[in-house]
């Protein structure tokens, strides 16, 4: 069945499984982050468990032990996740794309409220699955913009969304060919 593991580099050209109790997923993704700004890396996992249940779960790193944090994110498979501080408030927010248990495509943005909680913001991103999301300051204005690719209801798409601040993103209609 599907697995999710972390291997620690023991500095002797060997990697050792730390035996963290993460749910195994396929058709998904795992990403490092430091959402709580405590200097250690936390983990988010999204995908299909062996039972077929779709999950998106965040795990806080507490001195090398990973504890599930029940935030209530939308559960997605065929997903991608990109962390970035889109609102320039000093903490990591994230964009996520994928497909729900019911087959609905999603593209969501979660704002880190700096208190261990996240709120969903509602920019008009095209819903996709089986794609990629990434942040970068393409217009050099000091805030990060979003690149989003994947399979939409109308076929493959690639979009660039300019961050206009205050949770507003504008599709710049870039000449990007769908993948």
What are the residue ranges of the model-derived segments?
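Hydrophobic beta-strand segments that make up the repeating blades of beta-propeller
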Residues: 1, 43-48, 94-99, 146-151
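Beta-rich catalytic cores
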Residues: 2, 26, 54, 77, ...
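A short loop-to-beta-strand structural motif that recurs across blades of beta-propeller domains
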Residues: 3-7, 55-59, 106-110, 157-161
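Blade-edge motifs of beta-propeller repeat domains
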Residues: 7-25, 60-76, 111-128, 162-179
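A generic structured-segment signal
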Residues: 27-29, 45-46, 55, 78-80, ...
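Beta-propeller blade termini
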Residues: 28-35, 79-86, 123, 131-140
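Short polar/acidic secondary-structure junctions
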Residues: 35, 48-50, 86, 99-101, ...
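Acidic carboxylate motifs that coordinate Ca2+ or other divalent cations, activating on Asp/Glu
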Residues: 38, 42, 89, 93, ...
């Amino acid at each position: 069945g599907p697995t999710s593991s972390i291997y620690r580099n023991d500095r002797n050209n060997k990697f050792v499984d730390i035996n963290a109790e993460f749910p195994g997923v396929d058709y998904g993704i795992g990403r490092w982050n430091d959402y709580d700004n405590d200097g250690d890396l936390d983990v988010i996992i999204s995908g299909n468990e062996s039972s077929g249940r779709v999950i998106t779960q965040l795990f806080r790193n507490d001195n090398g032990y990973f504890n599930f944090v029940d935030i209530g994110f939308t559960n997605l498979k065929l997903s991608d996740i990109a962390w970035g501080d889109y609102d320039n408030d000093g903490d990591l927010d994230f964009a996520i794309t994928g497909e729900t248990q019911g087959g609905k495509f999603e593209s969501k943005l979660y704002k880190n409220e700096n208190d261990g909680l996240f709120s969903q913001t509602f920019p008009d991103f095209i819903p996709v699955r089986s794609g990629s999301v990434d942040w970068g300051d393409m217009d050099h204005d000091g805030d990060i913009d979003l690149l989003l690719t994947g399979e939409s209801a109308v076929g493959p798409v690639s979009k660039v969304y300019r961050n206009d601040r205050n949770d507003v993103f504008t599709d710049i209609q870039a000449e990007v060919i769908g993948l």
